């Protein structure tokens, strides 16, 4: 995806900051966020004035972006060659692809330009490397648990392909990717039932210090069109969201212990890399404009 260079200089430099944002700062948002169906990722390099990121994000919070459901910043710290390499993966959530296209096609507003000009040295984003995904976020908000509100959390990324397994155990790529998506979505309900039951039973787990588990959510990302290499090496990315690293490891260990039957059902249509990618992630909600 290639846009006019000066638009990237103004706009893409602008999606900034790997940091914690206070959710309570946006209590007066007049429009309830919609569940996003489309998401974009950009790989960005930390600039020389990274220390100014808090000022930049504070100003970002005062702008309106039509159709944007929210933003995340991810910085890999384990499980990938790019860990701690001075880059941030910036993620945008949109109500729809149409809203995202309208934003990019219309170009930045004067307010947006002025803001970007003030802060362009904080982060530099590779506009030509933008990646487009359809996103499923099936778990209801009222089932996720209580996030602590500081905007910081842990993402654990599975890199996966849709596959078939022959009777002799040979694993092959699935030709019909849409069938793979159908089978995956058909398991969301059973997976969420498993998570709910685990949360219900958490009070007697020896590792549970509070008598309950921390919050949990997940998102599944499939390509919308062609994305740059090497991202097309995988058919989908499954991302688990936890409040802390400790919580992530405890839940993953519990999955190994109790989730074998459900894992076998996922294995019928998919294969994921054994190495998981851990990222420290942060939330940023812009003003919402219907």
Residue ranges and their predicted role:
Residues 1-12:
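N-terminal Sec-pathway targeting helices
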Residues 16-290:
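Short S/T/G/P-rich N-terminal loop/turn motif that feeds into the first structured element of a domain
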